[in-house]
From Swiss-Prot:
This is Dihydroorotase. Zn(2+) 2 binds at residues 99, 136, 174. The gene is pyrC. The modification N6-carboxylysine is found at residue 99. Homodimer. PROSITE patterns: DIHYDROOROTASE_1 (PS00482), DIHYDROOROTASE_2 (PS00483). Pfam families: Amidohydro_1. Keywords: Hydrolase, Metal-binding, Pyrimidine biosynthesis, Zinc. InterPro entries: Amidohydro-rel (IPR006680), DHOdimr (IPR004721), Dihydroorotase_CS (IPR002195), Metal_Hydrolase (IPR032466). Pathway: Pyrimidine metabolism; UMP biosynthesis via de novo pathway; (S)-dihydroorotate from bicarbonate: step 3/3. The active site is at 247.
């Protein structure tokens, strides 16, 4: 039986939500992952270190008994964020990064940044103290096509920001385009990118061909096949600038299966099985540990995990539930549209 042992992975972009949903989904992450960067776009958002501390305590209380899991907290950047509070959060060890959502870019992002000049004092302080900025890299202006938002963000927002603050460490989260891959590769320093599980597997046909498939709808939206292939090449290359951030984002089914459905795909439960399939397809199983377990910690200045997990390839396909039941309601699990034979032993 084929097997692969690697250091326990981390998830560098995760939505856990709160309340009953948090309690219903956290076990799917804590079973396999040692750490995760937790997104702050709650309602209301996590905007201060006090908010982050309280949210962290709720997460810790929800972790299933026996699981060892560390939530890495972030702050939601607004035009009113206080630089001293951000610095204190970093000094205390509570805050791992600050998250930039352009206003209106994704779920619960309406309080995000509209005028970057108002956020510059905080960004300048972050550059000074070495605190990374995680960016949702899309513009939201109505004249830009949704499939072009990432390229437009690089050209009109990110590159000018990095020219102005070259010492600011920036993570381009959930990149979805060849443009994003090439931009990161062209950088000499202070730029890296996370890649989701689902963007390695689906292109925009998955959402639109044969009827609208709401459970493949996410933001940033999946792009053309050429972009998916560029992401796969980057993820499986071993390049230290690319690492796993699942962007696993649970929504109850009624909020997905409606006239104006929410963006988000739930992948925490089967991510490692999906990744092993993808990396085996690319003859790159030897690069999976770098992508899932090594590159992310190195970028964020943390040691890799000492614990290991073992993936085993089984003859029979591994059965994952079509849905998970949470106290908030049912959540549909990502279906990669191929049988999964790799299993976490």
């Amino acid at each position: 039986m084929k097997s692969l042992t690697l250091r326990r992975p981390d998830d560098w972009h995760l939505h856990l939500r709160d309340g009953a949903m948090l309690e219903g989904v956290i076990g799917d992450t804590s079973r396999h992952f040692a750490r995760a960067i937790i997104m702050p776009n709650l309602v209301p958002p996590v905007v201060t270190t006090a908010d982050a501390s309280a949210y962290r305590e709720r997460i810790l209380k929800a972790i299933p008994e026996g699981d060892r899991f560390e939530p890495l907290m972030t702050l939601y950047l607004t035009e009113d964020t206080v630089a001293d509070d951000v610095e204190e959060g970093k000094k205390s060890g509570l805050i791992t990064a600050v998250k930039l959502y352009p206003a209106g870019a994704t779920t619960n992002s309406h309080g995000g940044v509209r005028d970057f000049n108002k956020a510059m004092p905080v960004l300048e302080r972050m550059a000074k103290i070495g605190l990374p900025l995680c960016v949702h890299g899309e513009v939201t202006t109505p004249d830009v096509d949704i499939f072009d938002r990432e390229k437009a963000f690089i050209d009109t927002v990110l590159e000018p920001l990095r020219q102005r603050l070259p010492e600011l460490k920036v993570t381009m989260e959930h990149i979805t385009t060849r443009d994003g891959v090439d931009y990161i590769k062209s950088s000499n320093a202070n730029l890296a990118g996370s890649i989701t599980t689902h963007h390695l597997i689906i292109n925009r046909n998955a959402i639109l061909v044969g009827g609208i498939k709401p459970h493949y709808y996410c933001l940033p939206v999946a792009k053309r096949e050429e972009h998916r292939l560029a992401l796969r090449a980057a993820a499986t290359s071993g390049d230290a600038r690319f690492f796993l951030g699942t962007d696993s984002a649970p929504h109850v089914d009624p909020l997905k299966e409606c006239a104006c459905g929410c963006a988000g795909i739930y992948t925490s439960i089967n991510t490692m099985s999906c990744l092993a399939h993808v990396f085996e397809d690319e003859n790159a199983l030897d690069k999976l540990e770098a992508f899932a377990s090594l590159n992310g910690p190195a970028w964020y200045g943390l040691a890799p995990n000492d614990e290991t997990i073992t993936l085993v390839k089984r003859e029979e396909a591994v059965a994952f539930p079509e849905k998970i039941e949470t106290g908030a309601g049912p959540v549909t699990v990502f279906d990669p549209m191929f049988p999964l034979h790799w299993d976490v032993n």
